Amino acid sequence: MSVSFGRPEALSLVHRSGAVLILVLGVACSPQPPASETASSTPSGAGTVADDLSPQTLAAGRDVFRFDTFGDEQFWTDTARMHEIVQKSVSAAKALSVGLKVDADAIPPDVAAAIKAGKVDLNDPATTVTLLKLNAVVGLKGVISTVNGKDNLTRLGITCALCHSTVDNSFSKGIGHRKDGWPNRELNVGAIIALSPAITPAQKAVYNSWGSGKYDPRFNIDGKSTPLVLPPAYGLTHVANETYTAEGPISYWNAYVAVTQMHGHGNFSDPRLGINIRQTPDMVGPKLASLRAYQHSIEAPAPPAGSFDTEASVRGRVVFNQNCITCHVGANNTDNNSGVLHTPSETGQDPAYALRTANKAYRTTPLRGLWQHAPYFHDGSAATLQDVVTHYNNFRRLNLSVAQQRDLVQYLKSL
């Protein structure tokens, strides 16, 4: 996600400071990015050759995804001053209420037992600082100094996991084992940004209007607000281009987000965006290969047992193949792997966001793990899979019967 502090005047911030994270947005330097990633096919040298899937590389990539800020404390601490707010007024209860998650595996057994017993004050900001000291807040990285027995949060940054990981709630709501790649649809990014003392009341109003699970990755560029649903970061192995508008492959996306959105200390250049950021040392580029390898290793989650009607899904697959497969083609159910994009008028989608992008069109969304990440469409305008089917049945005049629509929904749940 991108934290923006204004409009054209915020463009200077785009070049040196920042935004919250959403692994979205990527505008390739060619009208249609190629399906494969090479160093010559993506800007800023972001492309890579085939993934190194060794255990060492995957472990390194996992650590980057979960814990690496790329030096973005230069924005979140020095500019946004978020550490001050967290230290003074963000209790653990408040953090959980805006969708932040806690990694139960990072909490020592004695602390976990104390929380269970109600002996830890979740309404005290000091508890949040303690959780940061334990490296237990998913997607946040703090530096703690202890003076006269008191822990003080002196630096704060964000990681990829902030928006693209959640937990299984196995300990309690908001606390559990990590689920990397799952979008945190409970995360209220705008409300978090609005806590910053460095933004204006007008900006706070925009941020607070987004709601949970949404973020606008261009607000800091053009000042317009059409927030998007946080996308999943799993099942990406054979997906050519990321983001709702397919503006770049995964390595471009990671470089763009790390430098211009998270505001990490690294290099990114794209003349089409008017961005040319060069920072020494480069704390982003050397980590892109392992990060991509780890992301490619995250498989889409299988639907839970009993979550769909098996017999209906078999019938629904027939309906799908007769009506949907022209666009949702191949193993990952997207024709964008062949370079195809669709104008809003082709799909009946709101054009507002697409018109702000280089491609002015939307990608056919891959469908693996579809059951997990409601709401649907780029703007979350379809609350359920039934809403998706109803939309296309009406817009494309498919004339599906009620039974066919129900079967199709069950098939989509099975993917």
Regions found by a protein language model. Name each.
Residues M1-L13:
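N-terminal secretory signal peptides that target proteins for export/translocation
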Residues H15-V20:
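Sec-dependent signal peptide recognition
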Residues L25-A28:
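C-terminal motif of bacterial Sec signal peptides marking the signal peptidase cleavage site
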Residues P31-R62, F67-A161, S165-K173, H177-R292, ...:
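Electron-transfer interface patches adjacent to heme c in soluble/periplasmic c-type cytochromes
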